Amino acid sequence: MSPNFADLLLLVDSRLPAGGHAHSGGIAPAIEAGLIKDIDQLEIALRARLKHQGPMQAAAVRLAAKGLNPDEIDHALDIRMPSKAARAASRAQGRGLIRVADQVWPEIGFEVIDHHHPVAFGVIAKSFGASEVAPLAFLQQSLMSGASAGVRLMGFDPISVTFLVSQMRSIVEEVSQSITQIESIDEMPAGSLPGLESLTENYSKAQVRLFAS
């Protein structure tokens, strides 16, 4: 059976053995630094990630899913991501995703690549014929991964966190819509959160940590 939109849903499932559950997009480092102590502060951090980093990531997914050169998209992300630790985490997720996809859908024959997570996600989505919805799916996955850090590290009520994620769907849709006219790598937005990126650098050096990033 050919991959389709239903298969794309597997990519946003936290149970997918691609290592995504170990990454929080900077939320875990912020928690460890004492910057997130309640659900309201978690919401602020998640909103900031979506609004500042989301457009850049979603645009990369879109361009990769449209079939643009993944190496060039990958290089564009490198330039736009100042944190070495964040870049390493993104590439680790990308490798994990491609590795799983190659084993779950061997008939497609995914090329082994060492690309950022958004690029790998877009490449896979293209093979599923799900290019148009790929940015939205990626943003939703990113949101859920960050939110899960609040549950696992702070013991926040899972239902309350799920409610928070559902209330943020309008932001996910807004960011996804904001990049629908982007057709070239030069048009990719650049967005960073210096605070979270600095914390991610420090966090990557910690001897004991639940999340990789």
What are the roles of these predicted feature ranges?
Residues 1-213:
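Metal- and O2-centered redox machinery and metal/ROS homeostasis
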